[in-house]
């Protein structure tokens, strides 16, 4: 069964090519992740470099179709930016303006639509919260990274 991987900001900042590494599955970038990436673009560190690389990569893919409908990837998967699920119920005590909670809200909304949703994040607290609201969750690590990406440095300095 095809999986739907929702990718957290920290995964893209860690490895901008991560969005290409989920084989023939769907990859979702919640709109709040784009907002968070945008906040890193002027950073002079590796995080800033990776945010800029990710922006160029997503922009390059955007030219192949509509991100809100999904863009076919070379590996058979599909990339999509998700802007919906603002009305999906979350625990009343959770601040819906907090980025992590918005990401979880997107995951929950997609799950309620029948998708096999997996949140991929390097954030341990987000993994704990995902588990608390019954969202499948995994850390991003080597099993997702294609062979060609394993030898690259974490800072990506070349153009897409």
Regions found by a protein language model. Give the residues of each.
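Positively charged, low-complexity/disordered segments
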Residues: 157-160
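Active-site-proximal, substrate-binding regions of enzyme catalytic domains
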Residues: 3-118, 124-155
């Amino acid at each position: 069964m095809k999986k739907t991987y929702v990718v957290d900001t920290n995964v893209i900042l860690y490895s901008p090519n991560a969005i290409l590494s989920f084989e023939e599955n769907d990859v979702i970038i919640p709109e709040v992740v784009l907002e968070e990436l945008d906040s890193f673009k002027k950073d002079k560190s590796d995080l800033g470099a990776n945010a800029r690389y990710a922006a160029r990569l997503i922009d390059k893919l955007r030219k192949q179709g509509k991100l809100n409908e999904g863009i076919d990837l070379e590996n058979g998967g599909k990339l999509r930016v998700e802007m919906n699920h603002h009305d999906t119920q979350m625990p009343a005590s959770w601040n819906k303006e907090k980025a992590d909670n918005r990401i979880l809200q997107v995951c929950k909304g997609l799950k309620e639509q029948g998708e096999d949703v997996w949140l991929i994040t390097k954030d341990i607290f987000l993994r704990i919260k995902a588990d608390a609201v019954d969202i499948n969750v995994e850390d991003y690590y080597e099993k997702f990274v294609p062979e060609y990406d394993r030898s690259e440095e974490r800072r990506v300095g070349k153009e897409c």
